[in-house]
């Protein structure tokens, strides 16, 4: 890996990103309300020509600003003749993940070396939370990429001695605000502001400069908000206040993703699977020393550590802490809110893994062997299901039929492509056993772990997941409805009693409405 130049590593990373993400975006139909709720907004834009505040789902306004929906509409118009599909609706998220991964590589490669940056990029690409978000039609991955990109640009501005205007950072913050509201500007400015203070920059200088960049970044969003208010009036203004200020101050008229304070710790731990398993295992291989609890001494050591910390390390550490604490404040908590800290965690995790290799820690081989066993067990379970060795009668309870449908879907997987993808992690798992026996521990083992992880994702994304999730899809119901009430007959009406009493965020048949081309009222 030492002979790999930055340019070659970049193109290698790009190819791997494209090959492991893009081919599988359209295989799964919509199976939750979240994705079609966003994609139908883009459908309405293309259908009605209203790119400011289109109405959908029976007259409902979008709950988020339009940049993400513009992206879907633009992609759909460019590659699919203006037709919004599962694939085109997920493409902006995939592009955002790929772009963020590549930019992260370039950022750290320039400052910390190609080898460390490449491993950090692979870890970013293969943790569960980002991998899932990069294949979803939701605003969060695009917001994450814009936020992280703005942070990188503002750090580059810091390296230049705070001289000039960071136009790219301002543009990215503008797009972030147009994706999910003021948080797209607040987060980058808050993180960089605290970082500058820790680096000894005068408070008023940092505050005034970042305030100026924040104001500039809000010009484009302000234009949209004015145009949207002219269309939506007080109804739009009330929605904006609820979704932004109400969510942050815990004064929403309805409960939205309300979770306890420890929720963020749990979701961060789960979101970094499978790498969290490696970290947990490594804790048993470290050498620990006795220490005494002396608050004054610890605080002095901590402040000295911060003062002497490498600028890139401090910037990454500040990003993690500030964003994490920021999203602990509101009652509304979701795992995806924390995604902007994932690339910075990947950087520290990559450093830690190289440290483990340097110490010749056996945990690297142990973890790789666990992944190999999982790969082999996954294939074994597939063969067992394919042979019909598990009776459907073992499933009982309310979700019995869903589980039976999942099992039948896995049993019905066929086709050379799907079977080839299923075989990949199995082959890699077998190869791992020979590789780790014949070779002494070195840095190449870390990239072998990445390959094992990617092999599992290929099988899941290309074969297992589409089969299982499509068994939950209601697309076939929409097809049957079309036979009875074709599109030529016009609008259809839905009735959901729960929506009549909902304080906010009413329930709709989002999936059916998308597959029926926004005909439900």
Where are these regions (language model features)?
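Membrane-integral, polyisoprenol-dependent glycosyltransferases
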Residues: 1-365
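Membrane-embedded architecture of ER/inner-membrane glycosylation machinery
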Residues: 2, 167, 288-521
């Amino acid at each position: 890996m030492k002979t790999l130049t930055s340019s070659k590593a970049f193109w290698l990373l790009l190819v791997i990103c494209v090959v492991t993400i893009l081919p599988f975006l359209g295989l799964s139909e919509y199976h939750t309300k979240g994705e079609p709720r966003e994609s139908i907004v883009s459908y309405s834009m293309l259908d009605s020509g209203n790119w400011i505040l289109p109405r959908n789902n029976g007259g409902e306004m979008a709950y988020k600003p339009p940049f993400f929906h513009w992206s879907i509409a633009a992609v759909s118009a460019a590659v699919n003749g203006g037709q919004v599909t599962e694939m085109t609706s997920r493409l902006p998220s995939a592009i955002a993940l790929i772009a963020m991964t590549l930019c992260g590589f370039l950022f750290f490669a320039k400052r910390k070396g190609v080898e460390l940056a490449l491993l950090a990029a692979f870890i970013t690409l293969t943790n569960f939370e980002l991998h899932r978000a990069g294949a979803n039609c939701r605003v969060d991955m695009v917001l994450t990429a814009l936020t992280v990109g703005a942070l990188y640009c503002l750090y580059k501005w810091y390296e230049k001695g705070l001289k000039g205007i960071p136009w790219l950072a301002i543009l990215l913050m503008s797009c972030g605000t147009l994706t999910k509201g003021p948080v797209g500007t607040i987060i980058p400015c808050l993180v960089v502001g605290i970082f500058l203070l820790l680096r000894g920059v005068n408070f008023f200088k940092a505050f005034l400069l970042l305030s100026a960049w924040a104001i500039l970044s809000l010009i484009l969003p302000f234009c949209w908000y004015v145009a949207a208010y002219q269309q939506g009036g007080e109804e739009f203004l009330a929605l904006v206040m609820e979704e932004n200020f109400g969510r942050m101050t815990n004064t929403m008229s309805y409960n939205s993703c309300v979770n306890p304070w420890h929720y963020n710790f749990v979701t961060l731990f789960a979101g970094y699977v499978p790498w969290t398993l490696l970290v947990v295992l490594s804790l048993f291989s470290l050498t620990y020393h006795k220490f005494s609890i002396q608050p004054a001494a610890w605080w002095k050591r901590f402040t000295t550590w911060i003062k002497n910390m490498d600028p890139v390390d401090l910037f990454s550490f500040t990003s993690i802490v500030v964003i994490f604490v920021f999203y602990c404040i509101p009652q509304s908590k979701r795992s995806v809110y924390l995604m902007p800290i994932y690339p910075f965690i990947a950087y520290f995790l990559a450093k830690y893994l190289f440290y483990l290799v340097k110490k010749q820690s056996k945990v690297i081989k142990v973890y790789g062997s666990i992944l190999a066993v999982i790969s082999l067990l996954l294939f074994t379970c597939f063969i067992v299901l394919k042979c019909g060795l598990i009776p459907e009668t073992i499933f009982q309870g309310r979700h019995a039929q869903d589980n039976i449908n999942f099992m039948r879907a896995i049993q019905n997987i066929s086709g050379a492509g799907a079977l080839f993808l299923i075989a990949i992690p199995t082959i890699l798992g077998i190869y791992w056993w020979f590789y780790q026996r014949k070779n002494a521990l070195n840095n190449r083992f870390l990239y072998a772990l990445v390959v094992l992880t990617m092999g599992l994702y290929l099988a899941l994304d290309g074969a297992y997941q589409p089969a299982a999730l499509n068994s939950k899809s209601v697309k076939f119901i929409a097809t049957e409805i079309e036979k009875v009430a074709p599109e030529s007959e016009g609008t259809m009406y839905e009735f959901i009693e729960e929506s009549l009493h909902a304080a906010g965020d009413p329930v709709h048949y989002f999936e059916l409405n998308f597959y029926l081309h926004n005909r439900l009222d």
